């Protein structure tokens, strides 16, 4: 389902960036050094504003390596494909589980073997395997970590 709103120049593009054709091409586009560098600059600007939650395959290792709390949220390819499949069906879109699974595996392979910012957890990240967990359970684990690492108010 929909967990957040993604806006571009004030226009809601949440579902557009979740389309299979975007997912199928994001690894190839992000492999360009210029694209990655421009994105990293923008993401760091956002992070410099203060407390922020960022999602991305290189946030903890490249974009925000000094972040106070890093979480490497993972799930098996099968679980991620199942979730995407269910999301597409819930939106009334056609979906093929095997095709989605192949795409997840292909993206993992590309991202984990690329020379520039390969997919890997930061050494100081809290690793969470979310297989079999629903969104509320994952949220609970993350919030527990966030409040443990949160400095007391002065």
Which residues does each predicted region cover?
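Residue-level signature of catalytic and energy-coupling elements of molecular machines
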Residues: 10, 39, 53, 104, ...
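Glycine/charge-rich, flexible interdomain linkers and switch-proximal surface loops
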Residues: 56-58, 62, 101, 117-125
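Canonical AAA+ ATPase core
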Residues: 60, 81, 90, 100-102, ...
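NTP-dependent small-molecule kinase module
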Residues: 7-14, 23, 85-91, 110, ...
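Long, charge-dense, solvent-exposed interaction surfaces that engage phosphate-rich ligands
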Residues: 1-9, 19
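Generic structural signal for secondary-structure transition and capping sites
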Residues: 34, 44, 51-52, 109-116, ...
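ATP-dependent NMP and nucleoside kinases share a basic, alpha-helical "lid"
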Residues: 14-93
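An amphipathic alpha-helix signature
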Residues: 77-85, 97, 101, 105, ...
């Amino acid at each position: 389902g929909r967990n957040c709103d993604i806006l571009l120049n004030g226009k809601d593009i949440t579902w557009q960036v979740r389309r299979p054709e975007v997912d199928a091409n994001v690894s190839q586009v992000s492999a360009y050094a210029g694209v990655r560098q421009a994105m990293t600059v923008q993401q760091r600007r956002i992070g410099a504003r203060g407390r922020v939650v960022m999602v991305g395959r290189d946030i903890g290792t490249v974009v925000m390596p000094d972040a106070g709390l890093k979480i490497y949220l993972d799930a098996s390819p099968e679980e991620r494909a199942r979730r995407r499949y269910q999301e597409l069906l819930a939106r009334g879109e056609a979906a093929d589980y095997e095709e989605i699974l192949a795409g997840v595996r292909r993206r993992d392979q590309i991202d984990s073997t690329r020379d520039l910012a390969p997919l890997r957890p930061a050494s100081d990240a809290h690793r969470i395997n979310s297989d079999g967990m629903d969104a509320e359970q994952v949220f609970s684990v993350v919030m527990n970590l966030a409040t443990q690492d949160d400095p007391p108010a002065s």
